[in-house]
């Protein structure tokens, strides 16, 4: 569904649509340098709510060949929005895409990199090693549910995970 819309970044506090695979950069992990490509994840929206940072780009590390494939299909965006094409693509994903097995997830890890630059041009970056993305998502969701269930009074409204659980929640 997202292929038809291209990419999304936040610039000067506003969400801005950009082409699919709009920008790439090298991500300097401790174990290797990887190619990152911009992706329209929800973090483009939520990170601004949590931090107030006005300019946000989210990257995913992929092989350079994947970046090239994504850029080749940019012109197909309008076609990808048609219901029959959507149905075909969804059926292909359902048949061909499988997540990792429990055995593979057990020992897998995810590396998260972040970088921030202030108005004076000073930069800071950090790298965090977590369990694989599937496991991390489940553990985080269960922790949030436990907090909500234990609350003495209802916690209403909209929260990002870090606004509800604290900025260091991912470290617990």
Task: Give short role names for the model-derived ranges.
Residues 1-172:
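C-terminal catalytic/substrate-binding lobe primarily of soluble NAD(P)-dependent oxidoreductases
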């Amino acid at each position: 569904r997202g292929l038809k819309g291209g990419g999304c970044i936040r610039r000067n506090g506003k969400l801005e649509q950009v082409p699919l695979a709009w920008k790439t950069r090298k991500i300097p992990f401790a174990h290797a340098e990887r190619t990152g490509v911009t992706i329209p994840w929800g973090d483009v929206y939520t990170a601004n709510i949590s931090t107030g940072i006005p300019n946000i780009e989210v990257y995913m590390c992929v092989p350079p060949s994947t970046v090239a494939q994504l850029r080749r299909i940019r012109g197909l965006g309008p076609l990808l929005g048609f219901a029959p094409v959507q149905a075909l693509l969804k059926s292909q994903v359902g048949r061909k895409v499988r997540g990792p097995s429990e055995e593979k997830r057990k020992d897998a890890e995810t590396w998260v990199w972040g970088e921030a630059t202030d108005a004076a041009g000073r930069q800071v970056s950090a790298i965090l090693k977590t369990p694989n993305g599937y496991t991390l998502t489940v553990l985080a969701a269960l922790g949030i549910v436990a907090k909500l269930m234990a609350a003495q009074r209802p916690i209403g409204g909209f929260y990002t995970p870090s606004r509800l659980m604290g900025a260091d929640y991912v470290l617990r």
